[in-house]
Amino acid sequence: SDSYILIGTDEYDEKIKTFFSILEGEKKLQNNKFFFEEILPQCFAQYKFWKLMSQTQYESYNEILQTMNVVVEFDRDNSDYIYNRTDLQNLPGKDFHKKKNLVNAFLKNSNISIKNLDTTNTKDAFRILQIWSENRNLKQTDYYQCIDALNDISQNNSILSGIIVYVEDNPVAWSIGEFLPDEKTYLVHFEKGDSNYKGVYQFINNATVKNLPETVLFINREQDLGDEGMRQAKLTYRPCGFINKYLAFKK
C-alpha cells in the first residue's frame, strides 16, 4: 500500500501542541520527491512537530530533512520500553525481589479470579476506572483514552484485548493491550487498579504476561512521557531495550 500520513493532536488537553506523525506502507518515502517538496512543507506549516518518528525514518530521512532546515532530536520521553517476557512473568533474582513480594501480598486476598476483558464485564472495568480517577486532574491522565478503549471493547469492535481481576467477585484491576503484527510482542496500553489492595499493580502486570500465549517473547510497555515517577517505575522492571523515537521541527 502507499505511504500515508496520520495527523493528530491531543483533544483532551488544550496545552498539547499540534503534531503530525507519518505511518508508512510498503512504498517507502525516501525517493518520493513530491512528498518532500510539497506534502512535508505543508505539514510543517500547519503543525509544529513531526512526532513519534521511528529509528528507521530517522536514519532514512535525516539528511533530507537537514536540507529543509528541519531539526531532528532524540525523543527520550516517547521512546518505548521493551521487556523480556520471562522477566515480567517469573520476576527472577534480587532485582525483582520487591516486585515478587508485592505480588505475594496481593495473593493473600481470598477468591482471586482472572477473566478476559470482554463485552460481559467492561462495566466492572469502568467501576475500577472511576475509583482510580478520584482526586486526579483527569486532563493530565489517560482517563479519556481508557474510556475510549473500554467503549471499543464493550461494543466488540476492537483489536484490543485484556484481562480483569476480581477479589471475592469485586473488580479490582484490569489491563488492556494488543498483539503487534510480528505476534512476538504484546503492547500494553493501560493498567488500572484499586490501590486499596496492596500489590494490585504488580499483580496485574504479572498476570497480564502470564495470560499471554507462549509465542509472545517481548512486552512493550510504551513510553514514560517524561514523567519522572513513571520513568523510575518502568526502569525498576529492568527493560531489555528501547524503541527509539524522534521529534522533528523547523528551525
Which sequence ranges carry the predicted segments?
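Conserved GNAT acetyl-CoA-binding A-motif
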Residues: 42-56, 213-222
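Acyltransferase donor/substrate-recognition loop-hinge adjacent to the catalytic core
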Residues: 67-137
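A short helix-loop-beta-strand connector motif used in the catalytic cores of GNAT acetyltransferases and
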Residues: 1-3, 152-163
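Conserved active-site alpha-helix within GNAT-family acetyltransferase domains
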Residues: 57-74, 101, 225-242
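Short, glycine/charge-rich beta-strand/loop segments that flank catalytic centers
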Residues: 47-65, 77-80
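Conserved GNAT-fold acetyl-CoA-binding loop/helix
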Residues: 136-149
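Aromatic (often tryptophan-rich) hydrophobic motifs at membrane interfaces
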Residues: 161-250
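Conserved donor-binding loop and adjoining core beta-sheet/short helix segment
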Residues: 1-49, 166-195
